[in-house]
Amino acid sequence: MNTKLTKIISGLFVATAAFQTASAGNITDIKVSSLPNKQKIVKVSFDKEIVNPTGFVTSSPARIALDFEQTGISMDQQVLEYADPLLSKISAAQNSSRARLVLNLNKPGQYNTEVRGNKVWIFINESDDTVSAPARPAVKAAPAAPAKQQAAAPSTKSAVSVSEPFTPAKQQAAAPFTESVVSVSAPFSPAKQQAAASAKQQAAAPAKQQAAAPAKQQAAAPAKQQAAAPAKQTNIDFRKDGKNAGIIELAALGFAGQPDISQQHDHIIVTLKNHTLPTTLQRSLDVADFKTPVQKVTLKRLNNDTQLIITTAGNWELVNKSAAPGYFTFQVLPKKQNLESGGVNNAPKTFTGRKISLDFQDVEIRTILQILAKESGMNIVASDSVNGKMTLSLKDVPWDQALDLVMQARNLDMRQQGNIVNIAPRDELLAKDKALLQAEKDIADLGALYSQNFQLKYKNVEEFRSILRLDNADTTGNRNTLISGRGSVLIDPATNTLIVTDTRSVIEKFRKLIDELDVPAQQVMIEARIVEAADGFSRDLGVKFGATGKKKLKNDTSAFGWGVNSGFGGDDKWGAETKINLPITAAANSISLVRAISSGALNLELSASESLSKTKTLANPRVLTQNRKEAKIESGYEIPFTVTSIANGGSSTNTELKKAVLGLTVTPNITPDGQIIMTVKINKDSPAQCASGNQTILCISTKNLNTQAMVENGGTLIVGGIYEEDNGNTLTKVPLLGDIPVIGNLFKTRGKKTDRRELLIFITPRIMGTAGNSLRY
C-alpha cells in the first residue's frame, strides 16, 4: 500500500513539474557566431518568456554553467559540438524548476549576457590573466545520506560551482535538486557522489560563499576587448517587439563616437562620420511584411561615412536605446493618441484599467465621473459645462473604457497632466487649445529679435536666394514661410554669408536648414572616348561580346551573362546574350548600356581593334564635374565667314567665326541608390560645300543627338549611329599609252571608292570617393 501511494505521489510530482515547465518559456534554438578578437556569441532563443540567466565559471575543467529559472527546453538536439579553439561543446538539460546550459571550453573563459528581444546573447572571451579568480573553499565529500534524509533536506543553491552533472527531469523528480560548493579545480563528480552530499554539508557553506556569484568573471568581458576589435565590422539586424514596433540593431565595431540622426519626411537617416563601410557589406532589408512602421532598412556607404536609412510609413516616433559604444539600437514605435495633445487617432484603443461593474439609472454624469475617479485613483476635474444624466449598465469593464464610453456618449474629451484629468466638452477643449497656441504665437512674434551670420562653406549664397524666395526688392518675410513677419534676410556675395535677423526659434530653424543643405556636393568623373570605326565594327563588337555567353532558350535562365542593362535593337530569336547590344548596324540601335563589370572588357576590345586599324580614337577626354552640373567637351575649329551688312545706304563687310566642332555635353544626376542619370547632348559639325544658285558656297553640316539614360556607377553608355561617307573616283592608267585619245581607254581603269565610317561615343561616369572606382592613367 505504501509503495503504491509513493508511486502515485511521485507521479503527481512529475506531472506538476511538467505543467510548471510547460507554462513557462522554452529554449527553442541555440546558435553560435564569431566576433573579432576571438570572441564568441551564443544566441539562445525563447518561444515566449525570456529569462536572464544566473551562472558560474570553472577553470578546471574549463566550463560555463548557466541556469534559466522556470524554463524548459524544446530542442531535438541537446548536445552541440563545435570545432573551435575556444568553444568545444554545449549541453542542455532541464529539471522541474529550471534549464541549464553547460558550455565546455577548450581553455578558461569568461562571459557576460545581454537580453535582445526574444534572445539572450552570451558573449564568451578567453579569461583575462591579469584578473585572478577569487579563492573558493573546498568542501570534502560526506558519507551518503539515506534517501529519507535527502528528501527532507532543503533545496539549496551555490553561486560558485556544482559537483554534479545536470540530471534529467525524471531523476530530479526523485531527489531534490542539490548543489555543493566545491573547489574550482575539482572535476565534476558522478551522479552517485552528488547524492551523497548531505544537508549538513550544504548548510555548512557560509552564506557569503553561496552569495559570492562570480560577478568579476561575468563582467570580465571588458569593454576594452570589444573596443579592440578591428574597425569596419558593421552589420544590421531587424526584429519586431510586442508593441508592434520595429527594432533596428546596428553593430559598428571600431566606431567610438555618436551617430548623427536626422529625419527627412518618411526617412530616418543615421550617419556614422568617418566610419567607412566596405562595399560588400552594403545591404537593404525589406521588412514591410512585419507590419511595423518600418518598411525598409538600408545600410550603405557615402564617401567616408556609413549611413543607415530607415524608411517608415504612417505615424511613428523614434526612441534611441543605444548604450554601449559601437552598438546602437533604434526603436520605431507606432504613434498613438496623446492625451495631453488631444490629437485625433483612429487606431483601436487599448484599455488596461482595473475591471469594474456599474449599474445606474438616470444618474448625474458628474456622479459617474466621481465614482470612476475613486476606482481609478486619478484626480478628475469636470468642467461646469459637464451636466446631464445617463443610464449605464456595465459588467467587468476596464474603468478607462467606461470613462471613454461616458465621454463619447456626451461628446466630451479630456486632457491629462500627470494624474490629473480635465474633462470638458470637446469644442470647449479645442477652443482652449487654439487660444493657447495663439498666445504662444503672439508671444513668439513679440519676442526680441536677434541677428546671426551664417557663412556658407560649400554652397553659393546666391543659391539660397531661390530656396528662400528672396529678391533685392523684398527681403522681408512677407513672401517667405520660414521667416517671421518681423524678420529679414540679407545676402553678402562677397563673403558668401547669410545675415538673418529674427527670433531665436526662426534662427534655429535656419541653422538646421543650413546644416542639411550646406554639404559637399558629390563629384562625377566623366570619361568619354570618341571612336571612328569602320563600317561593320559595331556589329563585330556585339557578336564577340555575345559569343562569351551561352546559347539559351527564352525561358532558360541558366546562361552566364556579363549583365547588360538594356539595349535597343533586333531580338535574337534564340535568346543569345549579347553583352553589348550592337548586333546590327541600323540607326535604331544607336544607344546601348554596358554594366560596370563589362567595362574593362570593352576597353580591351577597343584597344585591340585600334591595333588592327579597325578603329581610330579621335579623342579621349576626361572631365570632373559636380552632381547636377553641366560638363562640356568640344573638339574642332572655327570657320571664318564673311558677312555683308547694308545700313543707311552703305554697306560694311565683317568676318565672323562659326564653330564646327564635335561637342559633347553631359549633365550627371546621382540617384539615392548610387545610379547616375545622364542627360547627353552630342553635336557633330563639319564644313561642307553647298550650292546657292550657280555658286558653291561654304556651309556647316550639323548632326545633333539628345538623350537621357540611367547608367550604373562605372557603367558605359554607348552612343552611335552617326555615319560619314566619302565617295571618290579612281583612275589607273599606263603612262603615255593611257593618254592617247580613244585608244587610251584600253590602257585605263576607272573605279569608284566608297568609305563609310561610324562615329561611336563611349561615356563612362564614375562617382568619386566610392570604393572600386580608382582611375588609372
Curated annotation (Swiss-Prot):
Residue ranges of region Disordered? 135-156, 197-236
Q: Which keywords fit this entry according to its UniProt record?
A: Cell outer membrane, Competence, Membrane, Protein transport, Signal, Transport
Q: Which residues form a coiled coil?
A: none
Q: Name one GO cellular component term.
A: cell outer membrane
**Where in the cell does this protein reside?**
Cell outer membrane
Q: Which NCBIfam families match?
A: IV_pilus_PilQ (TIGR02515)
Purpose: Required for type IV pilus biogenesis and competence. Could function as a pore for exit of the pilus but also as a channel for entry of heme and antimicrobial agents and uptake of transforming DNA.
Q: What is this protein called?
A: Type IV pilus biogenesis and competence protein PilQ
Gene this protein is translated from: pilQ
